[in-house]
């Protein structure tokens, strides 16, 4: 198991990718608790009951964010993050009717981060 100093050695590109993959979950976790429109997505994606799934999503995102940032069980956390983001890709695809570009609500952003997390899981 790597030491704390090894986990935060920013001369190692893998550590930078791992930390960023975890950190980028933080605004999404925040939104699930403090942005009312977040629930609307879970309703539109037909997750039933939507509020429960929104909190399940927040719990998964919190767990993988902490694990990835700190370098704890990296391979498993990154694999779970990639799976979670793949489910998000499918949900966004269904809600938007297949839009690609993230700036018009498409799934491009989720797919990019799912791939990044998969790379971290393979290296982890």
Annotate each predicted stretch with a short phrase.
Residues 1-34, 51-59, 63, 70-124:
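Extended, low-polarity transmembrane helix blocks
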Residues 35-48, 75:
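Short juxtamembrane and helix-loop transition motifs at transmembrane-helix boundaries
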